[in-house]
Amino acid sequence: MISVSDDYLSEEQFKSLTSIHLEYNKVHWVGKKSNPENALHELIQSINEEGIGATAWYNIRPINPKLHNDISSYTTYMGKSYKPSKLPKRTYLYYIHAPKTGGQLIIPDIDEEIKPISNRLVSFPIQYDHKIESYTGNRVSIGIIFWPEIPSIYKNANENNILTFNRLWEEEDKRNTI
């Protein structure tokens, strides 16, 4: 059900991933057959999950961690669902930096808490709602979802390309709080 893999990347791969400069506030699309351009793309392709490609995003510091579901977050914009008919199977989280205290991944459906540890890859069924426990310090993770069918909101994404998109859930959250 939940998979945890510690020391997922080699020391060299981890160093490369933590030293690249990317747009952290964007969703990164990496097509399954694309040529990796950096360590983030290599991380995504190393997971080897089924799908046309994957979306990945950096979680630096959630302002107000809330229980959420990644399918809804990734496929809803302006109140409209762009959910594909064939859904991903799992959510992946890769931890780059662990906080001083707290920051556990909480999955209420199965009464599970997973501690954030640097260089840890975690995956769980995508339908599970989850959130991050409050924490102190710096916590950085990368969320990754492999799509067997691309949501129509991600225009021009395909198995051969690499693109960046705005974070739909941030735009949706702003719209719902105004």
Language-model features and meaning:
Residues 1-121, 127-178:
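Fe(II)/2-oxoglutarate oxygenase catalytic core
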